[in-house]
Amino acid sequence: MKRSTFLKSLAYTAALALTPLAAVAEDGPIIVGEINHYKRMAAFAGPYKQGMELAIEQINAGGGVLDRPLEFIFRDDQGEPGEAVKIAEELMTREGAVMLTGSILSNVGLAISSFAGEKGYVYMASEPLADSLVWSAGNPYTFRLRSSTHMQAGMLAEAAAASGAKKFATIAPNYSYGQDAVAAFKTALLALVPDAKFVAEQWPGVFKIDAGAEVQALERSKPDAIYNVTFGTDLAKLVREGGDRGLFDGRKVFSLLSGEPEYLDPLGDEAPEGWTVT
């Protein structure tokens, strides 16, 4: 399904569910509240916004939704859960939004999801990948656009099992997404390779990585392979420091999200070769 078709269908459903019938016939726009980390994660959020704007243009050129134009109100939450919830409340109660979309970081997405479930607002989570978003912490009002972390970690576990590696080290941001990603990989890999060993687990703060210290810790554990969940600026620092110190030489690396253009392109000439990525 094309993004514009999906977006139109979702906005249509939300408008019918949340807008009084008397208001459906009005001429004003159907408003969607979009919350994201536009400054903090500009390399990802910028193209993401441009894609939405293109889809909105196509939808409105085709007659809009319920014969009304579709309008997005974009807000920056600075990557802070509390700020995101505050903005969500304002969008729904003051701006007249019929639904919420957005978020990249899982801790922010979980905060919006909890708020949406409590208030009965439809929330389309664009990028938060923590499995708990739609599993343990899920609710009937929250939907996710992306494939799950469980699925992507499972694919990498299959590749890791086929590599013949037995000793693994992991590095992941210490918040919900990173924790879910490591847990899913370990479960999937041990089901395929029962004698696999995890010799190190590194948990840098998200966007606060001390790459030198993390590389040293990984090297000391002498793994056969590394499972990486860092992304964005943390990934860039890890790749640079690990490359300079030879961490990846002769080792398999299995890495979540690192093949996506938003995270791969900024690495430029430092982009690692031979990694298995999603």
Show which residues each predicted segment covers.
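Beta-alpha junction/loop-to-helix N-cap segments that form part of ligand/metal-binding clefts
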Residues: 29-31, 44-50, 63-135, 145, ...
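Periplasmic-binding protein-like
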Residues: 91, 95-104, 124-126, 169-172, ...
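N-terminal export leaders
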Residues: 3-13
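Extracellular/periplasmic periplasmic-binding protein-like sensory domains
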Residues: 242-278
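Extracellular/periplasmic Venus flytrap/periplasmic-binding protein
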Residues: 86, 131-132, 139-245
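Loop/turn elements at helix/coil->beta-strand transitions in domains of secreted/extracellular proteins
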Residues: 28-31, 67-71, 94-99, 118-122, ...
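Glycine- and acidic-residue-enriched helix-capping/strand-helix junction motifs
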Residues: 41-50, 176-181
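Sec/Tat signal peptide C-region and signal peptidase I cleavage site
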Residues: 19-25
